[in-house]
Amino acid sequence: MLVYVCLVVILIQLPFGAAGGAALGVIAKVSVDAALQQIDDVWKENTVRYWKCAVENRSTKTLYALGTTQESGSMSTIFADIPPQSTGVFVWEKSRGAATGAAGVVHYEYDNKILSIMASIPYDWNLYSAWANVHLSDHKKGFSDLYNGKNGARYPTRAGNWGNVDGTKFFLTDKSHAEFKVIFSG
């Protein structure tokens, strides 16, 4: 037996032109058992969604940990400074017991600039894809700017592809437990 799940998202034109008007309808077939298993996994906190990030600092200056911008989930490890010619590692995971992905931005200070690193791992791989982006600017970039490629940020790179933005190379695997490699040269 199959259940038809219909998701309709309608974006309404905002008065200040912040979003374009569009409608999207997506229909996906899901077996009843699979749907119930997903719900059960969320309640039992069995759903794995996280991104493990290794930031390689090839520059001559320290990357100072400046904080995070949470979209869904949070950092589950210590967020530390990264000295020159070193690599820092952290993990960002989804919120426990919630049907969300793992998405957010980490910020490092570098020589009066801010390096913002964004990744988004979806909860539902049938409807969404994983995305990554990096931006070096005078101020912190929020999740929305990096995810949508707005306010000076380039459009994000889909997981499974190398990105190269502002002298920073990065690669995000296309998995629910993604690995994110960032190579910062300064």
Curated annotation (Swiss-Prot):
Give the signal peptide as a residue range, or say none if absent.
Answer: 1-21
Does this UniProt record's set of keywords contain Cytoplasm? no
Q: Does the keyword Membrane apply?
A: yes
> A Gene Ontology MF term for this entry?
toxin activity
Tell where it localizes. Answer: Nematocyst; Secreted; Target cell membrane
Instruction: Identify the Pfam families for this entry.
Output: Anemone_cytotox (PF06369)
Name of the molecule in the record: Hydra actinoporin-like toxin 6
Q: In which tissues is it expressed?
A: Expressed female germline during oogenesis.
Q: Specify the species.
A: Hydra vulgaris
PANTHER family associated with the record:
BRYOPORIN (PTHR40388:SF1)
Gene Ontology biological process terms in this record: cytolysis in another organism; monoatomic cation transport; pore complex assembly
Q: Which GO terms describe its cellular component?
A: extracellular region; nematocyst; other organism cell membrane; pore complex
Primary location class: other
Q: Which family would the database say this protein is a member of? A: Belongs to the actinoporin family. HALT subfamily.
Domain comment?
Answer: Composed of a long N-terminal alpha-helix and a core region rich in beta-sheet structures. Before the pore formation, the alpha-helix binds the lipid membrane, partitions into the lipid-water interface and stabilizes the monomeric molecule on the membrane. Finally, it traverses the bilayer, thus forming the transmembrane pore.
Keywords for this entry? Membrane, Nematocyst, Secreted, Signal, Target cell membrane, Target membrane, Toxin, Transmembrane
According to its UniProt entry, the function of this protein is described as: Pore-forming protein that forms hydrophilic pores and causes cytolysis. Compared to equinatoxin-2 (AC P61914), it reveals lower cytolysis activity (5-12-fold difference, tested on erythrocytes), a larger pore size (probably 2-3 nm) and different affinity to membrane lipids (100-fold lower affinity to sphingomyelin). Binds to sulfatides. Shows cytolytic activity on HeLa cells, with a different potency than its paralogs (from most potent to less potent: HALT-4>HALT-6~HALT-1>HALT-3>HALT-7>HALT-2).
Show where the record puts the motif Cell attachment site: 158-160
